[in-house]
Design a protein with these regions (language model features):
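ATP-dependent adenylate-forming carboxylate-activation enzymes
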Residues: 20, 32, 48-57, 126-146, ...
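Conserved AMP-binding A3 loop
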Residues: 66-95
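Gly/Ser/Thr-rich phosphate-binding loop
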Residues: 162-216
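Conserved ATP-binding loop and adjacent catalytic segment of the adenylate-forming AMP-binding
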Residues: 193-231, 237, 241-250
Length: 364
């Protein structure tokens, strides 16, 4: 029986993939979705031989490739930047397993995180189910109906689907944003059979750290390639892709990701340096404020931004999606129990949706 490779609008098998690479299948008509064409064409461009016999032959050929892949950064705080990353670096942490996994593709497939999920499925001959571009009700249905077993997504995306139980899911992976123990504990209620992983990756260098909680350590193999300086993560040029947009300090690149140490070796990712604002003399982390509000009963998702103020320097403005049965008045009252005075938003409004990037991060 031919194994299913990709499910989007159509079901594409591994034989279909091989036939396309060999010129025996045309996808350039309106029947195929943009994602289906992009995935098949991306793989074909990484193949240097004129004829592929089977999946094993395909993987052997791809692993020998010297090709680079064009990636875009997430564009969370501005226009995405272009990075060129080698295929070898992109698959360096992928483990081959015989588990018949079904992966949910929540990320945009032309970003680092999307490529890594794609290649994880491809190298293991697993099935990939596209979730990107579908609304949350459709996503919930697709997770269940297609028997998705593995999900990699941002904390924000998980928050939006936590109103039903998914017993079929075996592994949950966080990435792309600050995570918290509170969210990970909540996840266990809705994904009762899933183990939880937390990944730190960047478009510039790929996957770098992994843990089962919310703290990380620098792996031994990267000890001389990653440093923490002024509470920010810096990467050496040897592990970073090529780009005309990156600003260097000698051989080092500042990711802008902030950490706080919990002991000599372990640290937490606490957000982006661009999300620190001054309010009345205090440094306020917008992501930390969001995390605190997110803990409150009734809060489904919250976004905090800042606006310049002549008296305080900045004020905080919030958008919130809450569950039925809860009021904004109650949520505001409870904020005083978890926020410092200078962290309380001056303005807070209820919205039906919060704008996200293509990768499922809150867009600021």
């Amino acid at each position: 029986m031919d194994k299913i490779f990709l499910i989007d609008k159509h079901t594409i098998t591994y034989n279909d993939l091989i036939h396309y690479i060999n010129g025996q299948l045309s996808i350039w008509d309106s029947e195929y979705t943009e994602l289906e064409r992009f995935v098949l064409d991306t793989i074909k461009r990484l193949v240097s031989e004129p004829y592929i016999e089977n999946h094993s032959h395909l993987i052997d050929v791809m692993e020998d490739t010297n090709g680079n892949i064009e990636l875009r950064t997430s564009g969370t705080t501005g226009e995405p930047k272009i990075i060129y990353q080698s295929f070898e670096k992109m698959i360096r942490n992928i483990k081959l397993k015989d588990e018949n996994m079904v992966w949910g593709l929540f990320y945009s497939v032309d970003r680092m995180a999307g490529y890594q999920v794609l290649f994880q499925a491809l190298l293991n001959k697993d099935t990939l189910v596209n979730m990107n571009g579908y609304d949350y009700k459709e996503i919930q249905q697709r997770i269940v109906s297609y028997g998705v077993t593995h999900i990699s997504a941002t904390p924000t995306l998980y928050k939006m689907i936590l109103d039903r139980v998914y017993p079929n899911v075996k592994q949950i992976t966080f990435g792309g944003e600050r995570s918290s123990k509170e969210l990970q504990h909540k996840i266990s209620d809705y994904f009762p059979n899933a183990r939880v992983k937390n990944i730190y990756a960047s478009t510039e260098a790929g996957s770098l750290f992994a843990s089962n909680g919310d703290t990380f350590t620098i792996p031994k193999k990267f000890m001389d390639k990653i440093r923490i300086k002024n509470d920010e993560i810096w990467l050496h040029k040897d592990i970073v892709g090529e780009s005309f947009h990156m600003k260097w300090d000698g051989d080092w690149y500042n990711t802008g990701d902030l950490v706080t140490f919990v002991n000599r070796n372990e640290f937490k990712i606490v957000g982006r340096s661009t999300n620190i604002v001054k309010i009345g003399g205090y440094n306020v982390n917008l992501e930390l404020v969001e995390s605190k509000i997110q803990q409150l009963d009734g809060v489904k998702l919250v976004k905090i931004t800042s606006k310049e103020n002549s008296v305080l320097g900045n004020i905080l403005i919030g958008e919130i999606i809450h569950y039925d049965g809860y009021s904004l008045i109650d949520i505001k009252r409870n904020m005083k129990n978890v926020l410092e005075k200078w962290e309380i938003p001056t303005k807070l409004k209820v919205v039906e949706s919060i704008e996200l990037t293509e990768n499922g991060k809150i867009k600021r």
